[in-house]
């Protein structure tokens, strides 16, 4: 019983920990970039779509599969699995990763991408 409790507590601590290697400063910077560049169209709250889909539970999801959001045909057929690496490429040049995406976005600089991804790894769980 005690082992199960300890295993559960360990899992909870690991899940709540910041993204590997992300400092508090990087997380705060990522949140600022998210709020200024992403939040107009995206939320990190469950079931809270805006002009873009919610990013809650993004990592591990396949592009274009969130129920209740009207994705472009390009996003549905791209079948990109969202990982920190694929999101980094997408946030650099969305059209290069998903040609025909209806997301109008010019891309982010490398430091901003790292910060946003670190923030989403924590906030969008």
Question: What kind of feature is each model-predicted range?
Answer:
Residues 4-16:
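Bacterial N-terminal signal peptides
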Residues 11, 56-60, 89, 118:
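Generic alpha-helical structural context detector
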Residues 16-35, 44:
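Electrostatic cytochrome c docking/interface patches
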Residues 27, 31, 43-84, 102-107:
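Gly/Gly-Pro-rich "capping" loops immediately C-terminal to redox-active cysteine motifs
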Residues 35, 39, 46, 60, ...:
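Sec-exported extracytoplasmic/periplasmic mature domains
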Residues 38-41, 116:
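Hydrophobic packing within well-folded, soluble alpha/beta domains
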């Amino acid at each position: 019983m005690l082992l199960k409790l300890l295993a559960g507590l360990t899992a909870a601590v690991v899940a709540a920990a910041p993204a590997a290697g992300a400092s508090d400063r990087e997380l705060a910077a990522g949140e600022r970039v998210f709020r200024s560049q992403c939040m107009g169209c995206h939320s990190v709250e469950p079931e809270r779509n805006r002009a873009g889909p919610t990013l809650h539970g993004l990592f591990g999801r396949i592009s274009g599969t969130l129920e209740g959001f009207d994705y472009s045909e390009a996003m549905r057929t791209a079948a990109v699995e969202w990982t920190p690496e694929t999101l980094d490429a997408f946030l650099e040049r969305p059209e290069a990763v998903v040609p025909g995406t209806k997301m109008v976005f010019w891309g982010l600089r490398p430091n901003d991408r790292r910060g946003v991804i670190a923030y989403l790894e924590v906030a969008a769980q």
